[in-house]
């Protein structure tokens, strides 16, 4: 019930508002006083609802409805028909209704367009996802197909043509290694002297295509993309760069004053810069000279090179000097410099870089502008080439190298020497008489006796030093030769020497005495009959044989052949104890490694400094020329003490009063 009451009150309030709105819209003469008719309220409320944007179609409610009975009761006058309203009221009503209808249509269009745009965007997103997925699948399929093809090709080659494939791979590897070896050996000369490495298609295009249709086309100038040079204001070496201009004074190009190896001074430039009535401007002297006064004596149309001879003293007239040349056979990859004029008429040095070979020209990284043709490229103070232009197909400029002409652009040295026509002395005529005192052995002995070594000779050093400093200066006399074998037959001495060498090589010098005892027992030599000399030593290499004098020795049999030697070696080896030898060697080495070699007594060296003198005065003879008297050091590293404290007034000194 409460909700129904609220709804009824809302309907009555809306009807009252509609009535008030309609009464204000109608003329005041026809609608005087409030109207409480139910049908009028309903009609007005419907009209008001249509004005607020709600279209209601009710056939029961019309403009010609009879007057409500409530109006007579409430004192309301019946509403007037629509025909009685003015055109303004009707037009405003129609305009308001059209406005509301347009708003409704616009809202409907917005709703529909938003719905359709959402559908279209969703469809586009779905199609994009599908396209990306298909693209990825295509890439995967192509990639996997390439791997499968490579796998099948390799499987086929290894199955049916393994040897041929290995040979081809080995040849490719050898070719790459040979090319790298040639590049490493030749270096930069490979780009100019190895003509066989020039691409074949370039030569074919030059020979088969006409001049206008050639694949190698050139322009005059172009900047290189990506190359950043540095530019500084600087004049050319020897002021050798000359400006070329037209007859009206406008800029044409550049030329170079060069000095040839025959001593002449010539003008060098690009051939396309030689224009009729061209002038040479001398920036130093301010003079001009026409190019027609020069004679063209060397030209090359293939590389656009020209060399001209001028009148006498033309370089002095223009104020230039000749620069030296570097020909094409000595050019390599290196930084170079070229010179041009700025807008203010000042010379500028521009950096460039020679990168390689372009046919018979050189490729250069440089930034040039129209009018830079003919300017020279310098390596230090020498000219290496002339600026030509650029290629339409490549991203670099071109430089004209200087042709190698011996005697003109390069030196032609001829080494001349006199021929030898005979000897002044021969061996017989120049041979001098040499006495006994003049032999080489005599002078060698005298020289060795006169030399006193402060240290030992290399052959006199032992493994351990046990000598004092006084003994080091002495010369060790050579060992006396042993007198072993004086009473033995020569066959026996040779036999013992051979056996000693063999035993020394097999068992080493550690078991020398035992081996000698065994050998004497085998040969039947009595040990008591041998008188060894302890002060004498055997020669180096025969340490297994003891130096001794044999008194009585049985003569050996003449059947000393290889069987006896092999039997001796076999018996000696059987009696050897290798483990004991190895153990003793290890012990000796360990003992030597842990012991320190003794040293001689140390002595103080003599004083090398000059004696100090007491007092502050030192005589000039004892003064050191590179140092002065030592000043007193400060107490700390802080600020030095001032003569007067800060802020104190200084004494006037000898300043006159009139100055103060």
From Swiss-Prot:
What's in the keyword line of the UniProt record? Host membrane, Hydrolase, Membrane, Protease, Serine protease, Signal, Transmembrane, Transmembrane helix
User: Is Membrane found in the keyword set?
Assistant: yes
List localization entries: Host membrane
Q: Which residues form the Peptidase S39 domain?
A: 224-416
The superkingdom of the source organism is Viruses
Q: What residue intervals traverse the membrane?
A: 131-151, 165-185
A Gene Ontology biological process in which this protein takes part is: proteolysis
The record's GO molecular-function terms, alphabetically, read:
serine-type endopeptidase activity; serine-type exopeptidase activity
EC code? 3.4.21.-
Which chain positions carry the site (Cleavage)?
221-222, 416-417
How does the record say this protein sits in the membrane? Multi-pass membrane protein
GO cellular component term of the entry, any? host cell membrane
Database matches in InterPro entries: Luteovirus_Orf2 (IPR018019), Peptidase_S1_PA (IPR009003), Peptidase_S1_PA_chymotrypsin (IPR043504), Peptidase_S39B_luteovirus (IPR000382)
N-terminal signal peptide: 1-25
Which residues are annotated as active site?
272, 304, 373
Indicate the enzyme's highest-level EC class: hydrolase
Could you tell me which PROSITE patterns the record lists for this protein? Answer: PEPTIDASE_S39
User: Which residues does the annotated region (Disordered) include?
Assistant: 463-490, 595-660
- Which family does the similarity line name? Belongs to the peptidase S39B family.
What the protein does comes down to: Precursor from which the VPg molecule is probably released at the onset of the RNA synthesis. Essential for virus replication.
Q: What is this protein called?
A: Genome-linked protein precursor
Query: What taxonomic lineage is listed for the species of origin?
Result: Viruses, Riboviria, Orthornavirae, Pisuviricota, Pisoniviricetes
């Amino acid at each position: 019930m409460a909700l129904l009451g609220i709804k009824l009150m809302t309907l009555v309030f809306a009807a009252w508002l509609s009535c008030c709105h309609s009464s204000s819209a109608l003329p005041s003469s026809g609608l005087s006083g409030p109207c409480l008719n139910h049908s009028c309220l309903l009609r007005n409320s419907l009209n008001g609802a249509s004005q607020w944007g709600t279209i209601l179609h009710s056939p029961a409610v019309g403009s010609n409805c009879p007057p409500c009975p409530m109006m007579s009761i409430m004192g309301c006058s019946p509403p007037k028909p629509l025909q009685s309203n003015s055109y303004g009221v009707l037009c405003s009503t129609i305009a308001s209704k059209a406005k509301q209808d347009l708003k409704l249509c616009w809202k409907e269009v917005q709703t529909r367009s938003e719905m359709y745009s959402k559908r279209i965007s969703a469809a586009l997103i779905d199609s994009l996802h599908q396209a990306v997925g298909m693209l990825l699948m295509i890439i995967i399929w192509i990639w996997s197909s390439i791997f499968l093809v490579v796998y099948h090709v390799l499987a086929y080659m290894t199955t049916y043509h393994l040897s041929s494939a290995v040979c081809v791979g080995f040849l490719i590897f050898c070719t790459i290694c040979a090319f790298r070896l040639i590049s490493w050996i030749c270096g930069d000369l490979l780009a100019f002297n190895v003509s066989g490495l020039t691409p074949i298609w370039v030569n074919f295009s030059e020979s088969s295509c006409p001049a206008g249709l050639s694949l190698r086309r050139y322009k005059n100038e172009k900047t290189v993309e990506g190359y950043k040079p540095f530019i500084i204001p600087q004049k050319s070496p020897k002021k050798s760069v000359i400006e070329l201009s037209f007859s009206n004074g406008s800029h044409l190009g550049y030329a170079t004053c060069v000095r040839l190896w025959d001593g002449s001074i010539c003008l060098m430039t690009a051939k396309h810069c030689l224009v009729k009535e061209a002038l040479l401007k001398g920036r130093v002297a301010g003079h001009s000279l026409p190019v027609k006064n020069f004679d063209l004596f060397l030209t090359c149309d293939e590389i656009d090179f020209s060399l001209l001879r001028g009148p006498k003293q033309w370089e002095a007239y223009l104020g230039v000097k000749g620069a030296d040349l570097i020909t094409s056979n000595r050019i390599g990859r290196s930084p170079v410099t070229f010179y041009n004029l700025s807008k203010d008429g000042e010379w500028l040095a521009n950096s460039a870089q020679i990168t390689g070979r372009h046919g018979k020209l050189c490729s250069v990284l440089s930034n040039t502008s129209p009018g830079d043709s003919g300017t020279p490229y310098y390596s230090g103070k020498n000219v290496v080439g002339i600026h030509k232009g650029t290629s339409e197909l490549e991203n670099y400029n071109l430089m004209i190298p200087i042709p190698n002409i011996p005697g003109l652009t390069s030196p032609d040295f001829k080494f001349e020497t006199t021929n030898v026509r005979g000897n002044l002395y021969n061996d017989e005529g120049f041979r001098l008489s040499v006495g006994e005192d003049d032999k080489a052995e005599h002078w060698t002995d005298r020289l060795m006796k006169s030399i006193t070594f402060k240290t030992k000779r290399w052959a006199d050093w032992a493994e351990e030093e046990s000598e004092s400093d006084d003994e080091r200066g002495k010369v060790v006399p050579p060992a006396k030769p042993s007198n072993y074998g004086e009473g033995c037959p020569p066959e026996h001495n040779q036999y013992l020497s051979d056996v000693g060498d063999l035993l020394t090589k097999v068992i080493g010098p550690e078991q020398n005495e035992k081996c000698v005892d065994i050998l004497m027992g085998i040969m039947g030599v009595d040990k008591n009959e041998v008188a060894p000399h302890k002060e004498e030593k055997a020669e180096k290499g025969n340490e297994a044989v003891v130096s001794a004098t044999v008194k009585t020795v049985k003569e050996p049999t003449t059947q000393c052949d290889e069987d006896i030697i092999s039997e001796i070696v076999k018996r000696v080896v059987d009696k050897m104890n290798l483990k004991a030898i190895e153990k003793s060697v290890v012990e000796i080495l360990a003992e030597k490694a842990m012991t320190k070699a003794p040293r001689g007594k140390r002595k103080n060296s003599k004083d090398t400094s000059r004696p100090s003198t007491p007092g502050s005065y030192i005589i000039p003879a004892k003064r050191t020329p590179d140092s002065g008297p030592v000043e007193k050091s400060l107490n700390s590293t802080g600020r030095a003490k001032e003569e007067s404290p800060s802020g104190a007034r200084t004494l006037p000194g000898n300043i006159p009063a009139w100055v103060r």
